Each structure stands twice: as structure tokens, then as C-alpha cells.
UniProtKB/Swiss-Prot annotation:
GO terms for molecular function: DNA binding; zinc ion binding. It comes from Oryza sativa subsp. japonica (Rice). Gene3D superfamilies: 3.30.1370.210. It holds the Pfam family zf-CCCH_AtC3H23. Coiled coil: none annotated. It comes from the Eukaryota. This is Zinc finger CCCH domain-containing protein 10. Keywords: DNA-binding, Metal-binding, Repeat, Zinc, Zinc-finger.
Length: 225
């Protein structure tokens, strides 16, 4: 009776990953997205500077279209590279109810939607449900395989993840078999959504977009309050 070793499992996971990647990329080349009005800042800016760095403009302007932080703005964020907190929502912080957290800026949890979903442990770690059709000016989710980030369970709050799960650097270890399974699942979900939308009637697509977007638009209040 033959026994499988850890190397066999890694090779099998790698083979599955490469097969899924080939299928995914085969359909992605012809549908390269043009993002229109969506902000084009890179992920490092979004995680560490968006609504973190103080706005340098002294003249009055529209806060909701400005990527920088302003005095009294609910969307302001603590810098995750200098303040240690996780991407888990704080149970005592409620923007709508104006409930202040008793721990203040030293709280180990995220305050508000922007701190939660722009945290390095969360940002673009899940596929966007709208996929290529996403029209949000600010979206916390990945719209293709290059945007998808894989973050380990033990990722530190101040440690950024690799820019892409398909590229590695000297400082970044290769994806583990478990990471590969997550990548494969995410790519399969993206491909399934694209295939469904390509044959669905436009009215059904619009209704589905409205239903899917509804629970995700709560962060708009963070910009307006």
C-alpha cells in the first residue's frame, strides 16, 4: 500500500492551481477591464494612505471625492503601519449611532467600515460579487486574479501582503497548498459569475446587481457623516 507524502500533496495542489490558472487566464485576456470612474490608486496607497494621510489642500473641496483625511471626517483611519489593530470590527464602535469606543485610538479593533475593509488583512482578499461590472468608485474587493490578495491567518496588522498571489519576491514566501486552494476557489467563483452574466437578460443582471450591492453600500455613510 502506497502512502502519500507531504510533497505529493504539495505537487497535487500546485497542479490543481496551475490548471485552474490556465482556464481562468484563457477567458480573461479578452475581457481586460477599463475601470472608468473607479479610483486607480495602488493597493499600498489604499491600505496605508487612503483616508489616513492628512489632506494637504487648504481650500474647501468635496471630501467624498478626496482620498485624504479631513478633520471631523468619519472615514478617517488610523495608520495600520504605525497603530496595531486588527481588521475585526470593534463591537463598541457605531458610526450611525455616534457611539464612541471607550478605548479610543488605542483600540485593537477596527473602527468603521473603512478601517475594517482597507486593513491589510482584509483589503482585496475576497472577489467582488459584481466582478467586471463593478461601478463603485471605491471597492474593497478584487475584480480579477491580479487584484486578489492572499493573506495568512497569522498576518500581522502592519505587514502588507504580496501584491499578487501569482508573483513572489525575495521577502515573500510562495503560496502554501492551503493558499492555492483559496486562489483556485476564488478564480472559479469569478469565472462562474462571468459565465452567468454573459447569458443572463440585462434586466435580471440589473436586479441582481441592486440586490447584491445593497448590503455593501453602508460605508457611504462614513464618507458623508
Amino acid at each position: 500500500m502506497a502512502y502519500e507524502t507531504s510533497s505529493d500533496h504539495q505537487l497535487a495542489a500546485a497542479a490543481e492551481f496551475l490548471a485552474a490558472l490556465q482556464v481562468h487566464l484563457a477567458g480573461a485576456e479578452a475581457s481586460s477591464p477599463t475601470w472608468g470612474g473607479r479610483c486607480a490608486y495602488d493597493e499600498d496607497f489604499m491600505m496605508y494612505e487612503f483616508k489616513v494621510r492628512r489632506c494637504p489642500r487648504s481650500r474647501a473641496h468635496e471630501w467624498t471625492s478626496c482620498p485624504y483625511a479631513h478633520p471631523g471626517e468619519a472615514a478617517r483611519r488610523r495608520d495600520p503601519s504605525h497603530v496595531t489593530y486588527t481588521g475585526e470590527p470593534c463591537p463598541d464602535f457605531r458610526v450611525a449611532a455616534r457611539a464612541a469606543c471607550p478605548r479610543g485610538s488605542g483600540c485593537p479593533f477596527a473602527h468603521g467600515t473603512f478601517e475594517t475593509w482597507l486593513h491589510p488583512s482584509r483589503y482585496r482578499t475576497r472577489p467582488c460579487r459584481s466582478g467586471m461590472l463593478c461601478a463603485r468608485p471605491v471597492c474593497f474587493f478584487a475584480h480579477n486574479d491580479k487584484e486578489l490578495r492572499i493573506v495568512g491567518d497569522d498576518a500581522a496588522a502592519a505587514t502588507p501582503s504580496p501584491r499578487s498571489p501569482f508573483t513572489t519576491s525575495e521577502d515573500s514566501p510562495p503560496p502554501s497548498p492551503m493558499d492555492m486552494k483559496q486562489i483556485v476557489l476564488a478564480m472559479q467563483q469569478m469565472d462562474a459569475r462571468k459565465a452567468t452574466r454573459s447569458v443572463a437578460p440585462k434586466t435580471d443582471m440589473l436586479q441582481q446587481e441592486l440586490e447584491e450591492d445593497a448590503p455593501e453600500l453602508g460605508w457611504v455613510s462614513d464618507l458623508l457623516m
